[in-house]
Amino acid sequence: MLRAHAPLRIAAALYLVFSANAALGQIPDPGEAAMAMVPEKNLCAGPTAPVAVGAAQWNGWGRDLENTRYQPEPAIRAADVAKLGLKWAFGYQGGTEYGQPTVVDGRLFVTSSAGRVYSLDSKTGCTYWTYDAASGSRTAVIIGELGQAKKAYLPKKLKHTLAHLDIIKAPSAAFFGDDSGTVYALDAQKGTLLWKTQLDTHPLARIVGAPALYNERLYVVMSSTEEAAALNPNYSCCTFRGSVAALDIASGRVLWKTYAVLEEPRPTRQNGSGIQEFGPAGAPVSSTPTIDVKRSALYVATGSSSTGIGQSLTDAVAAFDLGDGKLRWVKQLSRPDGAASSGFTNSPILRTLASGNQVILAGQKSGVVYGLDPDHGGEILWQAKAAESAAGGVAWGPAADHRNLYVAISGSMAQPANKQGSLTALDMKTGIARWQTPAPAPACTWGDRSCSHAQAQAVTVMPGSAFSGSLDGHLRAYSTIDGKILWDFDTAKVFQTLNGVKASGGPLDHGGATIVNGIVYINSGNTLLAFSVDGK
């Protein structure tokens, strides 16, 4: 079955199996590779400055609380996108998967599947610090200011003698999750550990979606590799349940945790190998939660059941109370045949229409895109079929400006590909397609074998241009007016890197482009690429 998938899908599937077996103690954990990595060579000169959260940034997965993936102030004109050239390349040590870059206050933060977390200068690419986590990570980092100093940050001898606590500033923190279900908080300036919390003890739990941050709380979702482990007939499937939790940002203390499968797993039957099976289970949450400040709500999109036992929160968009985590409403969007392609792997997007009404936008693996009403229990306002079949629908997520939703479609994963990937602009109010641009014929530097033009990567949009990556390694910019391709760069090549690491690009998947201060950042292979107008 793996032969029918595009190259990065094969890598992803193998990574799932690798991680699952590692958790079961059969092979080494990939995070162990981080301990053998050497220090970076291109260290920044001089002392590091404190990191302040500002307006010109891309913080976390979707850039804003609503997960729009829209950069309103890119410092690049759409007319100049065609002039983008490579500014620099940075090579990652170990691993082949990386979190989407976060850029805040002139600093770039990124995680890696080898466990190393990097803080770079966003303009020059020099290294401020690295931190080696115990397990691999592929979430985006989110930066938060911890505010005025808490008691935990004061020297003990000053607890009762300091007259004005507000003169002491606690550090900004870099938050991320890893493949063991652990959440980390690092000092964003120095890279030292502030705290870490094991959020889920299931051996196959992992955090894929980046945390969301609001009002001194960190909201974290949980996914797993159990679907891959279930391919092993000797594995007792399945007991993992997706969840969302709120943590105190200063201490990492869990304030509440709500499961997407409400019932605890129970013994169900024995499989053909005589192994006891369990259920209900599943509903992994693989994408960053969306914050609705107006309604004090948190929106998450869930995956499918892993046992076939029906549950109301599988294949759904659900709203939870920000304060206590209680379920507000759920809109289940399963296919009638219960196929796994009904699940979601991308974040809901909250957008305000010209009328002042708001809509929740969500794309399904089946290729169906929905507009939901946040004021009436997720009632379907419209739905649109963005893909011709369920073979390859919406993967890591659309982006939305003030007018359109830009949806990338994987098309067919079969080899040879018989259906193209595409980028489609849908009217946010009606779901009607304004334009659709099919992916160009796949052009892979490694040849025709396992070459796909599927567009699974998350989309990024700025005024006038939308960026979408393809599994053939090409990053393209499209006109938001008519879908015309404005710029095309093949990332699947060998690059000379700032830090001397041998690096090359490859298929583009998962995290999309990050745009800040006139620079477009993208991960490809084991390379971080930075583009600017004329490469300057």
Specify the residue positions occupied by each region the protein language model found.
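Bacterial N-terminal signal peptides
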Residues: 9-22
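Extracytoplasmic/lumenal domain signature
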Residues: 76-93, 117-137, 143-158, 166-170, ...
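Extracytoplasmic mature domains of secreted/periplasmic and thylakoid-lumen proteins
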Residues: 209-210
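Bacterial N-terminal signal peptides that target proteins for export
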Residues: 1-11
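Blade/loop signatures of beta-propeller domains
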Residues: 27-86
